[in-house]
């Protein structure tokens, strides 16, 4: 390890997404790689958690960065989020941010309704508003999950901020359905809510130009060790997830979490083929500019490694 530590800041997201960062820091894996990592809870996210958003029905009325806007202001240099949203935000960046790799967390989101809801299958949600966070995983996964069951114009979404706000809106009867990730899916099941449909999806890591090749490789090695630690036994780390659910909603125990929902892989390079599938989906729905190609959104070194990986797999 180098005697001189390189410092960088990584955004702290929902625990289910950021668990490899949390583990790598707690176990000293970043330090082992010569990197002093500061995990940053963005100021914008603090504000969003504290105050509920008014429902908004047009995705164009919401700026794509959400609480991730801190990377544009120098608040942090690396963050990860859903694949679709990262493509959109990388298109919109003014800070030279690029995709560098796939996220270690392979997350799931579910559309939930209350236990007394008349809805039971995806088809029942035709023309029913589903609460999502526009330009985030809940938004895109809802479009994808419902697309096979109804016409595109029958999929109705409405923006209601962060997951605790969407959950509470369903709980209070202000909205009929919402898309949420863990630990909120388990909280819903504990309260007798119904899961209408559920799907896994990839995320991407992006970084500003301060993340050079050496730092990129060091972070990736630390994340690989963290994933191995998590997959060896995730149970000591589950309290990070359950802590996100306030006790006045439900007292969620670590034993309430369904462990097969929690998937973590070694970070993989993002291939042109994967990009193209998501690009086509987004262009068809007017969610990204047709000019936002792989070469424009994916960082140079990551792009080359992604192409090599695709060639080796073919």
Regions found by a protein language model. Name each.
Residues 157-158, 162-244:
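Pocket-lining segment of extracytoplasmic ligand-binding domains
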Residues 2-143, 148-150, 176:
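Short, glycine-/small- and polar/acidic-enriched structural segments
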Residues 23-25, 109-119, 200-216, 263:
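A bilobed periplasmic-binding-protein/Venus flytrap-type ligand-binding module shared by bacterial periplasmic
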Residues 213-289:
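Secondary-structure end/capping motifs
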Residues 152-156:
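Juxtamembrane helix-loop boundary signature in multi-pass membrane transporters
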Residues 283-314:
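Conserved C-terminal helix/tail region of periplasmic/extracytoplasmic solute-binding proteins
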Residues 45-48, 66-68, 165-169, 184, ...:
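Short, hydrophobic alpha-helical packing/hinge segments within bilobed ligand-binding/sensory domains
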């Amino acid at each position: 390890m180098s005697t001189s530590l390189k410092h960088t800041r990584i955004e702290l997201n929902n625990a289910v997404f950021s668990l490899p960062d949390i583990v790598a820091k707690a176990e000293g894996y970043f330090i082992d790689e010569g990197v002093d990592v500061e995990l940053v809870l963005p100021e914008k996210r603090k504000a969003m958690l504290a105050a509920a958003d008014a429902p908004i029905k047009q995705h164009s009325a919401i700026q794509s960065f959400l609480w991730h806007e801190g990377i544009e202001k120098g608040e942090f240099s690396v963050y990860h989020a859903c694949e679709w949203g990262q493509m959109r935000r990388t298109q919109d960046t003014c800070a030279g941010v690029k995709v560098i790799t796939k996220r270690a967390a392979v997350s799931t989101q579910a559309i939930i309704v209350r236990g007394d809801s008349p809805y039971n299958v995806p088809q029942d949600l035709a023309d029913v508003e589903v609460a999502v966070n526009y330009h985030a995983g809940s938004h895109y996964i809802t479009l994808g999950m419902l697309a096979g069951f109804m016409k595109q114009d029958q999929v109705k979404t409405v923006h209601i901020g962060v997951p605790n706000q969407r959950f509470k809106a369903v709980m209070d009867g202000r909205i009929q359905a919402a898309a949420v990730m863990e630990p909120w899916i388990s909280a819903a099941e504990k309260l007798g809510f119904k899961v209408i449909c559920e799907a896994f999806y990839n995320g991407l890591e992006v970084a500003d130009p301060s993340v050079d090749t050496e730092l990129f490789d060091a972070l990736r090695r630390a994340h690989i060790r963290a994933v191995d630690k998590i997959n060896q036994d995730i149970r000591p780390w589950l309290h990070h997830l359950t802590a996100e659910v306030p006790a006045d909603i439900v007292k969620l125990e670590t034993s309430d979490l369904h462990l097969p929902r929690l998937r973590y892989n070694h970070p993989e390079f993002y291939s042109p083929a994967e990009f193209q599938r998501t690009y086509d989906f987004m262009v068809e729905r007017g969610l990204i500019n047709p000019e936002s190609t792989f070469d424009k959104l994916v960082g140079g070194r990551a792009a080359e490694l992604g192409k090599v990986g695709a060639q080796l797999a073919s």
